Amino acid sequence: MATPQRLTDPEIQTALGELGGWSLQGNKLHRQFKFANFNQAFGFMTRLALVAETLNHHPEWSNVYNRVTIDLTTHDAGGITELDVKFATKANSFAD
């Protein structure tokens, strides 16, 4: 599979405008999700793990009780790509 192309700054800003709750931290998309309890947070991560495998694109993430923090970047491309935007979009849809 070819390495995806890194998005330009205007493309990243457009994506952020469409991705509620996400921000830019360095060269990563960043968001913290809050759930009612640990079970919901872990269930969210489990569903997203299947997406990560399907996309062959794995997040930097952590879980503390009812919070899940996600940072997305494509290391091979040296920044944010469409894969990161796809993953963030899916994360938002699972959190709603």
From Swiss-Prot:
It catalyses: (4aS,6R)-4a-hydroxy-L-erythro-5,6,7,8-tetrahydrobiopterin = (6R)-L-erythro-6,7-dihydrobiopterin + H2O. One of its GO terms (biological process) is tetrahydrobiopterin biosynthetic process. The keyword Disulfide bond does not apply. It is an enzyme of class 4 (lyase). One of its GO terms (molecular function) is 4-alpha-hydroxytetrahydrobiopterin dehydratase activity. It holds the Pfam family Pterin_4a. The keyword Lyase applies. PANTHER family: PTERIN-4-ALPHA-CARBINOLAMINE DEHYDRATASE. Belongs to the pterin-4-alpha-carbinolamine dehydratase family. This is Putative pterin-4-alpha-carbinolamine dehydratase. It comes from Synechocystis sp. (strain ATCC 27184 / PCC 6803 / Kazusa).
